């Protein structure tokens, strides 16, 4: 889980760097190296879910072992893709001779994994079978299958240029449309299962339980869809995503509310304090729900990408361009010199509904000692509703006037907030249960009396564990 947390944080920071530094207006371009970081995250996330089936029911042991093997191998494959130069990427290193060593290491590791599996196969037999399609076990199984399909799709698209060159002699690349066409439906299905899973019981879920548990979340989905429709977010995939986000959010709220209500009735604490106590008594379960809440925020931000707008214009001093409710006016331009770079800076006044809001200062920098390597400094005005993202894209070759490229990206900030919640939820899940800590503390002390009743640690731990 610690490794998964760092992987999640790395992916999020990489996306933020691409957004704030590269100046292309986006945060994820399905670049081969970006994909390489996503592959082990997908299999690792699948393992974190399916290992709960092994813990609770003694199922999917072989599957879990191979998920661990594949996650490690995909980490090495990602390093190979980045360091060998076999794929074209803005993040990749130059061509080197280290590639064959990585291939050899991957083959040796795969052989060791297979031998270890064969030798221990008898210890990996499932202790139970699937009792019902409508059960939490089925939810985890479908969840894992979707993660596996997503991993295969991303891996195939990433390596397709390499295979096409081997077999046809020409390198054929697949772009973002290919990945989006496959990954958007898979992502929505995973989001749906994120909400459904907590509502299902182990072994089998009765019809009465389904009616009782699904009513409010479905109502929340309809309300969320109606609100986003009224606000003008009407693209089909995005509207469905907002509805699913409402559904998942309400399932999380219900899980906290039901548990907190019981604690409040027993202790007299407020619901908020009871929810905190609930989370501390079972950190793994409720830390997972916090992670799911973070994923809801991320999906809200991703859905906003369907409504991105941009405009590019060659501008003279005093010229203006309009983007959504914003008007951008080029007031002036200046140059500055620092120790290791020189920069051309545009000074742009931003008006909203004809009212002055702020000044933005996008730059184009040239760094000394790097063969005139240039870099873009983006100017961003960010709110929960949208980002105004302004880039000085260079000079028009014919007129020598500055070219300004402005983007209006809705809901991007929700992605970064979601990433923070994912990390916080993981840290909560890594903490020991409060009740378990008390038991361990008591166990380290001598008994007060030989006739004192013994405290059964296993019972106490089960009370605080999902």
What residues fall within each predicted segment?
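Solvent-exposed, non-transmembrane regions of integral membrane proteins
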Residues: 1-466
